[in-house]
């Protein structure tokens, strides 16, 4: 129990420190399989938001810190930081289809977004994911990621992405992930993300 508490505190300190270091676009960065029951995961993902209409691309960092509640349900805190933008949220994922070589899950959550200069928003996140394992240690996944945002003292908008990605098991407790988020509407920006996820108790 003490070890779990220390790990949770370490994850919280990481997310707090990241605010000071990087000034977010949510990322998927996981297959349809949930975190093993009782395990903890910390993922750090450098992310680029691709510029639109000739605009500059912007680098930032996204992070996820999660816990496996049951054999089919996990919960994750998520954060992302870009210049002038901070994003904090959480979601619950349910692994509803467990096939021999095909899995599917759905996630529901919420977030707040802090924009420098105004325009802060909050919203609901929905994601549907599917994955398969073509070879040992490698998973291919794809997802539909939606965010329904409401701007403080303003209007509403929706972010929508189709997200193909890969998850490669480097070792028993470390995964490498990479994905591209393809924007589906004018409100969204396409992105690329790559990084590592560490499982403390796998």
What are these regions (language model features)?
Residues 86-90, 187-190:
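A short, polar/proline- and glycine-enriched secondary-structure boundary/capping micro-motif
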Residues 1-2, 39, 76, 177:
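Generic N-terminal leader/processing signal
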Residues 26-35, 39-56, 67-68, 96, ...:
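Outer-membrane beta-barrel transmembrane domain signature
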